[in-house]
Amino acid sequence: MENYFESPFRGITLDKQVKSPNLVVGKYSYYSGYYHGHSFEDCARYLLPDEGADRLVIGSFCSIGSGAAFIMAGNQGHRNEWISTFPFFFMPEVPEFENAANGYLPAGDTVIGNDVWIGSEAIIMPGITVGDGAVIGTRALVTKDVEPYAIVGGNPAKTIRKRFDDDSIALLLEMKWWGWPAERLKAAMPLMTSGNVAALYRFWRSDSL
């Protein structure tokens, strides 16, 4: 298997890797896959190529750790309320399975917000929405939607804490800095690399007038 990464400290932005029409990515988001030696598309498990199929949508400025997995294709034909969870329908070449019903159910798009950090070998289940600014801990199993700026971890993943207080989170969601033009982002970089949300908000307000 080809290793797409020359160093564990250097990720490759997703826009230089992604080819699937059902994998949508924003700007600057990267996958740091050195230790698993595969492309990001290998992280999107069972991603169907069909038009109208569930999509994996990833925002801008996301950091995705090596070996993270996004489980796609809904229930993949497994119905736990049926007598058997086996997907007979998808083996039409077997004569005994000829009259099997199609158990596939879509889960809807999996949506990862902007500025999300996903730890190594975390697993995101189908149809999940991860809010802007969230952090997913290493090897977390995410089975429910994650609120913006929440830090979650564990199996199943639970909220550990919020990155900021509610007022600061509201300001960040109002500013949506990930959509700023390059000139504004450059001017704000000293504040972006600090924890002073109020100062960043003042900068944004003055720059927007």
Swiss-Prot record:
CDD domains named among the record's database cross-references: LbH_XAT (cd03349)
Catalytic activity: chloramphenicol + acetyl-CoA = chloramphenicol 3-acetate + CoA
EC number per UniProt: 2.3.1.28
InterPro entries assigned: Hexapep, Hexapep_transf_CS, Trans_hexapeptide_repeat, Trimer_LpxA-like_sf
Active site: 78
Residue spans crossing the bilayer: none
Catalytic class of the enzyme: transferase
One annotated GO molecular function: chloramphenicol O-acetyltransferase activity
Any single biological process term in GO: response to antibiotic
Keywords: Acyltransferase, Antibiotic resistance, Repeat, Transferase
Pfam families xref list: Hexapep (PF00132)
PANTHER family: ACETYLTRANSFERASE, CHLORAMPHENICOL ACETYLTRANSFERASE
Role summary: This enzyme is an effector of chloramphenicol resistance in bacteria.
Similarity section: Belongs to the transferase hexapeptide repeat family.
Name listed for the protein in its UniProt record: Chloramphenicol acetyltransferase
Naturally occurring in which organism (per UniProt): Agrobacterium fabrum (strain C58 / ATCC 33970) (Agrobacterium tumefaciens (strain C58))
